[in-house]
Amino acid sequence: MAENILAVENLNIAYQGVPAVMDVNFTLERGKVLTIVGESGSGKTTVIRALMGLLPIGGEVTDGTMLFNGQDLRTLSKSEWRAIRGKDMAMIFQDSGSALDPIVRIGKQFRELFKSHVEITNDECDRRAIELLESVSLPNGADILRRYPHELSGGQRQRVGIAMALALDPALLIGDEPTSALDVTTQSQVVMQMLELAKEHNSAIVMVTHNLGVAAYMSDYIIVMKKGRVVDAGTPQDILENPSNEYTKQLKDAVPTLEGGRYID
């Protein structure tokens, strides 16, 4: 039986005392993909921010456990968070451009990421960064490293964000709707690259999306959230063929299909 890399039990989160997430439970094995689906305000992004220790001011985990490789994330100090964030777990933001430092060249940002966790020369940083950029379909890596974030397109910045998230071979990759700001063609390419790279690195993925079709395409397991609670959970086949909640049925009905009933990826 595969070992769980992540186990969340009875997770409760509040903002300034107001409950936002209630009694969320799930587990995830290494190399598997779990997707959290729900509308805006459902609590899905709050859950993954809690997993990364990135809840905004006023946000607090009020109850429950979040075990990562057997360690309760709620017990970590600031220095312990710095040690694992980026190295053992990493996050791809909805808009990676906003997560990049606008006044620092991409190459220097890669160097800072590598050197915060491993002893490495500048030349080796650059070599590894170029390899990572090539793996996300940015073949002109040396040129990308010389650029500032504003000199790149939205799709390029998002690919840079994915490359940086994968730079240190994290065991857990977390994505906050990382393709929603991209055009449809680029979305498909980026999702495929994420899955391929995660498989190559044997990383587990927790992904947030509002699109049940995307979730069904990429997931081993799906959680559906509404108003801070899990209202449905199961494999993609379970969710699409036998949804147990009316809200899940509504999400399913919103997914476009081709003639014959096959869902569009």
Locate each region found by the language model.
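A short, surface-exposed alpha-helical micro-motif characterized by mixed small hydrophobic
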Residues: 215-217
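Conserved ABC ATPase signature
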Residues: 147-152, 156
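The feature captures the beta-strand-to-loop junction immediately N-terminal to the Walker
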Residues: 37-39
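ABC ATPase "signature
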Residues: 233-234, 242
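Conserved ABC transporter NBD signature motif
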Residues: 60-72
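A short, proline-enriched helix->beta-strand linker immediately N-terminal to the Walker B motif
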Residues: 167-171
